[in-house]
Curated annotation (Swiss-Prot):
Belongs to the RecO family. It comes from the Bacteria. GO terms for cellular component: bacterial nucleoid. SUPFAM superfamilies: ArfGap/RecO-like zinc finger, Nucleic acid-binding proteins. GO terms for biological process: DNA recombination; double-strand break repair. HAMAP family: RecO. PANTHER family: DNA REPAIR PROTEIN RECO. Pfam families: RecO_C, RecO_N. NCBIfam families: reco. This is DNA repair protein RecO. Keywords: DNA damage, DNA recombination, DNA repair. Involved in DNA repair and RecF pathway recombination.
Length: 229
């Protein structure tokens, strides 16, 4: 029997039997894990087992299954509403569908915290969208699916500001094509410059295609609520 203490967030919850809950937790130490919480239906635990509450969770592993031993909140629930709430649900769904269990990535965990806190404070939709685009890129990197914004995918030549490019999922950017993106926009995105509406629009277009490729046909329900990507 192995016991661990984890910094965690609830990504998904499903009731199990009359008293327990099956949890999908995103943790700094172990990545995404599946965990059984006995007594999860009690009022005290139900108040904790919600999305957007930072948790400190003690778990034990028995026969390749994680069980919670103790759950505490480390802070109050993030105040997400409207666009911020739908965006939080969106990134939770992304983690749920794309991450393999038990694959820790502290950088992605930090990006998740930064994004959640950022969208909780953001007052403009454009600021929320920029945060989402950066989180999507962090997720793509964590999943080993990256591409260059600085080089043409097939020739390796540098992206030219005055040229136009097409994004090909699984490859990157190729010169010309039906759905053309200015090279200037690609270079701005590479420099993390999403301050111009046109750059942000191109980033949204690119990331939607890249994330769809990563999802492999799985549907993100939060998109129908808000359409953040």
């Amino acid at each position: 029997m192995t016991s661990k203490s984890l910094s965690a967030w609830v990504i998904h919850k499903q009731w199990s039997g009359d008293t327990s809950a099956r949890l999908k937790l995103f943790t700094r130490e172990l990545g995404l894990i599946n965990c059984l919480c006995k007594g999860g239906r009690t009022p005290k635990k139900q108040s904790l087992l919600q999305a957007f509450i930072p948790l400190w969770v003690s778990i034990e592993e028995r026969y390749d299954q994680y069980y919670t031993r103790n759950i505490e909140s480390t802070s109050s629930r993030l105040d997400l509403e409207g666009h911020s709430l739908f965006s939080g649900l969106y990134i939770n769904e992304l983690l749920y569908y794309t991450l393999s269990p038990d694959f820790p990535d502290p950088d992605l965990f930090d990006a998740y915290l930064f994004t959640l806190n950022g969208i909780a404070l953001a007052r403009e939709r454009e600021a929320i969208e920029a945060l989402l685009r950066r989180f999507e890129w962090a997720l793509l990197k964590a999943c080993g699916y990256t591409f260059s914004f600085l080089h043409e995918a097939r020739t390796g030549e540098l992206i030219v500001p005055d040229s136009y490019y097409q994004f090909v999922a699984g490859e990157g950017f190729i010169l010309g094509g039906d759905k053309e993106i200015p090279g200037e926009h690609l270079l701005a995105i590479a420099a993390d410059n999403l301050s111009e509406p046109a750059y942000l629009k191109s980033a949204k277009f690119i990331m939607r295609q890249a994330i769809n490729h990563l999802l492999g046909g799985r549907e993100i329900k939060a998109r129908s609520l808000y359409g953040p990507a």
